[in-house]
Amino acid sequence: MNAAVLIDPARLTDASTRVQREPFPFVIATGQLPADARAALREDFPRYSGAGFFPYAAEDCGPSVNRLVEELTARPFADALGEQLGIPGLSAYPTLVTICRSLNKRHGTIHTDSKSKVATALVYLNESWPDTSDGCFRFLNRIDDIDDLAAPEIKPLYGAIAAFKRADNSFHGHLPYEGERRVIQVAWLTSEEEKARKTQRGKLSRLFKKLFGGIDRKLGAGRDRNAAHRD
């Protein structure tokens, strides 16, 4: 892999990107990562012992993933995304990066995200995906129906991005899925205090999952497809 830019804001704003304002502002884009970066990003992706999202730490990742995180949190990408979402100066907000390598069936219940988030971007890095809707990201019209889609579902394939402006009706989620599902999540937050609080909570969650991951997996195994929580 050469030193070329991994995430080019110009690609995000080309004609193939889907931008929607209703029922809330969101963006769907594919092909956002270069093909020649696949191998490095695969090798450099963090290896977590538990399932779910964990706070980004540079020491967990190899150089290409660290570079990608740096570019995703830099002003050019943030402001290009903010323009698409109707959020001027998105880069002015503090960022929180979390990374997921695998899920259990508890994850993906319908929710809006908390009010401490201004916007969220999910960048997928899976080189293939089964012929199933399980684990495919969905923007939704309502909180109680995973099948009431606001746009076509998004397979979490390499280079796909799903991003949205947080709102009281920014419902999203996916059908239960267990297994590897690589994704980097960038959240722009309302304050540094919220970033510190969420980071600390994420570290505690990582410890809990390391100690009690088997229980977490069993509790989520039978979750309802329309399971939801507000944030």
Predicted regions and their residues:
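Conserved short histidine dyad/triad with adjacent acidic residue
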Residues: 99-113
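Short, conserved, surface-exposed binding loops centered on an aromatic residue
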Residues: 91, 110-114, 129
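Non-heme Fe(II)/2-oxoglutarate
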Residues: 3-87
